[in-house]
Structures are given as structure tokens and as C-alpha cells.
Amino acid sequence: MKSLDIPKQFINVDGKPIIIRTLENFASHPDVDDIVISCLADKIEYMWQLIGQYKVSKVTSIVPGGENGHGSIHNGLVEVQKFSDPGDIVLICDGVRPLISQSLISDCIETATKYETAVPVTPSIDSVLQSEDGETCCKSLPRKQMYITQAPQGYTMRKIMHAHNEAERLGITNPISSSELLIELGETVHIFKGERDNIKVTTPEDLRFLRSRYYYKSFKNFAKEELKYGL
């Protein structure tokens, strides 16, 4: 999804680009020490300008993205590896999740610290059908066993770098997510409760939902001021 030919992470919502709102959630968390951004190569200078403009703290570096999501994550991890230890926790997140809560970040860190892997999920509320041709369905999957993955996903540097090294060795070039990569490599991935509001802004409907959330928040704040001053 693009708006006026702008990459979706740079779309302005209630006065700030989506990616800035996403970054602020991590920058304000007391257990997050450093932030590394993997960004479109031709947007790196612009990204630094935004970070300065909105005074986002803890951003230590911005690296060029890869040919796909997996490549972008890999480039970011290589940068993080320069100043981290194998047991350190790294949180991997899309730049278009501006509604991440502080408690979700805390739960991710806690789960990854305990199990080395942490993936937030929400139970599927709809029935899930499997189709091989996109026209007919051959299997109904048990809804009670179906979960929708979210981000941030947390891993020890040891665990996620090993997965990326194995992917390179085996020629795995474009897994959908880090959790999918680990599962494909035979690893067990630990899940924890995610949040339904933690949307990945992908469609025009997502953008409308996001804007309505900030509009409602602004309206509530205005109403409080009216009551405070008796307007």
C-alpha cells in the first residue's frame, strides 16, 4: 500500500510518520538499549532527518535493506552483532506497527530471555481453509490450533544468527518471517499472547483504522480539557 507514491512506513498519521510512531514505542521502553533500522537505501538520509526532527532516541545506526524482508533483517542483525553478546535479546519488528504497547514489548523480552525465542500471537477467530490452487479448498484446519503471528519477535542473538547462517548454507532466501525460518530449520518457537490492536499497516482499511484510533484519542483528550475548564 502506498499513499501518493510514499512507502507506507512514511505515511503521516496524526502529525507523525508511521515509522516514527513505531520507533517511539521502542525508544521509550526502559529495557531497550539500542535501535538499528534496516531501511531502503535511498531513504537512509531522509530517515536520519526524521529521527532528528522527532527526536527519537536510542537509534545507533541505519543500514541498507536487502532484496526482501529476510535480507533486510539479516543486514540489521549483522550490524547488531557488532556491539552485542550471543545471549543478548534482539527484537525484530516491522516499521509499520505503530500501536505496539509497552507491555507487549516487555512480554516479548521476558519470553525470549526464558526460551531464546518469543513470537506474539492471537488466536484465529475465523475458520481456516487450505487451498492449493486458490480456487478450491482441500482441507479445513482446526481453528483452535490456528494462531496469527505478530511482531516484535524476540530471539537471542545466538539463536537468530545461527538460523540466518543455516539459511545461507541451505539456500533458504525468502522465509516470510523469522519464526517461519526457525520452524523450517526444525526449531521450536515459543509463543505468547499478542494484542489484536497491534496491526501491521498494510491495506487502506488498516490505515483508516489507525487514523480513527488517533482521532478518537485526540477527541477524548479534547473532551477532558473541556471538562477541566468547564467549556
Question: What is each of the regions a protein language model found here?
Answer:
Residues 67-134, 150:
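Conserved beta-loop-beta/alpha segment of the NTase-like Rossmann-fold superfamily
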Residues 33-35, 116-117, 188:
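Residues at the starts of beta-strands that form the adenosine-phosphate
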Residues 146-231:
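Conserved alpha/beta core of the MobA/IspD/sugar-nucleotide pyrophosphorylase nucleotidyltransferase superfamily
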Residues 29-31, 52-59, 83-84:
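Short helix-capping segments at alpha-helix termini
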Residues 12, 99, 140, 154, ...:
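Short aromatic/basic micro-patch
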Residues 1-45:
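N-terminal glycine-rich phosphate-binding loop and ensuing alpha1 helix
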Residues 55-70:
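Conserved donor nucleotide-binding strand/loop of the catalytic core
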Residues 23-27, 51, 80:
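Hydrophobic C-terminal alpha-helix "anchor/cap" residues
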